[in-house]
């Protein structure tokens, strides 16, 4: 249920400031979005996986908090990442 190492590396390369930038808010938001999208596909077939759904809600909450932080600190990066990820905030 987790992302592969190659997929994570591609996301870090696309959204990070350099190849080893894994801690910036932009990268964390992009990784959480990829994981959330992966889990949404899982829940379309496994409707009664309530334990996994709880983890999904936790990830969504964490992403929302990171997006709020980014909006508060750097509005331009917030707008850019919303557009690049296709989020509807």
From Swiss-Prot:
PROSITE patterns the UniProt entry points to: RIBOSOMAL_S15
Regions crossing the membrane: none
Keyword Cell inner membrane: no
Single GO cellular component term: cytosolic small ribosomal subunit
Gene Ontology molecular function, alphabetical: rRNA binding; structural constituent of ribosome
Matching Gene3D superfamilies: 6.10.250.3130, S15/NS1, RNA-binding
SMART domains attached to this UniProt entry: Ribosomal_S15
SUPFAM superfamilies for the chain: S15/NS1 RNA-binding domain
Keywords linked to the UniProt accession: Ribonucleoprotein, Ribosomal protein, RNA-binding, rRNA-binding
Biological processes per GO annotation: translation
Any Pfam family hit: Ribosomal_S15
HAMAP family: Ribosomal_uS15_B
Subunit organization: Part of the 30S ribosomal subunit. Forms a bridge to the 50S subunit in the 70S ribosome, contacting the 23S rRNA.
Family: Belongs to the universal ribosomal protein uS15 family.
Protein name: Small ribosomal subunit protein uS15
Native species: Histophilus somni (strain 2336)
């Amino acid at each position: 249920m987790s992302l592969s190492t190659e997929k994570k590396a591609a996301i870090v390369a696309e959204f990070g400031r350099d190849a080893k930038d894994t801690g910036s808010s932009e990268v964390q938001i992009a990784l959480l979005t990829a994981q959330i999208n992966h889990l949404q596909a899982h829940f379309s077939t496994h409707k009664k996986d309530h334990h996994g759904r709880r983890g999904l809600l936790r990830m969504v909450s964490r992403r929302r908090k990171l997006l709020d932080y980014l909006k508060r600190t750097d509005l331009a990066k917030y707008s850019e990442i919303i557009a690049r990820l296709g989020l509807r905030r």
